[in-house]
Amino acid sequence: MDKLLQWSIAQQSGDKEAIQKLGQPDPKMLEQLFGGPDEPTLMKQAIAVIQNPEATLEDKEIAFDNFEMLIENLDNANNIENMKLWPAIVNQLEDGVPATLRVYAASVIGTAVQNNPKAQEDFNKTSGPEKLIKIASDEKTPKDLLLKTLYALSSAMRNFKPAYANFVENNGWNIISLSKENDHKIQLRQLSAVSSILSTGLDEDKQENIQNAKLVEYLVSILTKDGHIGCIEKALNIISELAHYKYQFTSTEIARLAQGLEQIETLSDRLTEEDLVSAKKIVS
């Protein structure tokens, strides 16, 4: 504040040497001095633009971008609920909304709830999880929207059991399937969602869902010598996690895993040794 006062005095006196020496003041300090809007106000203003039917698509995209930067701050993310802004964000996931705004909405959700138990709890009370699962389950969903949707779901479920319960209730396991989709970016996001599911442990119901979804079969299908190394490593890590939680592998799953491990033997020096050893113990 002293520096700001010195800068103000130098401006009034026209002392160019002092102005040059002091440099430009902190913009946030200037906002406080001259009554600029605080961050909660900026958040409200951004949402107002997004909801304004007269605003251009470009203006709405800019507003969403600014909003996401603001809610990277934990306090601001928690203020989404305090200011009753969750419904406005979730509404942007609707089918009739322009595609870019749906992508922004999913991205904002993922950023807000990531490693944030309060925001996870607040979001889980909305219709957002159901809408995200619907988007992720639709084969016609564009890739960029699918990626952000899976990111949001993963962030919402990680270390938060109620979100997984919501996931099951809305048939979320349908998004983890033996799809012919070979896009490694989508696979990585699907695997991240599985990792989030396992972050809250394993019980009988979850084991049953894993078997019904043929998750192990899906994981093993990724273990190929020509596969994407990042996907292979993530799949191995999940298999290792399943073993850690005492998942009961069937004889068929073990046989297929053995075949998969043979496929990636030549890649062993590029994979995490601990996960590889854990997977090999399952088939030994």
Swiss-Prot record:
Protein location: Cytoplasm
Any one GO MF annotation of this record: adenyl-nucleotide exchange factor activity
ARM repeat intervals: 13-55, 74-114, 117-158, 161-199, 204-244
Coiled coil region boundaries: none
Pfam families listed in its UniProt record: Fes1
A cellular component annotation (GO) from this entry: cytosol
Major place of residence: cytoplasm
Protein family: Belongs to the FES1 family.
Protein name: Hsp70 nucleotide exchange factor FES1
Organism annotation: Scheffersomyces stipitis (strain ATCC 58785 / CBS 6054 / NBRC 10063 / NRRL Y-11545)
Phylogenetic classification of the source organism: Eukaryota, Fungi, Dikarya, Ascomycota, Saccharomycotina
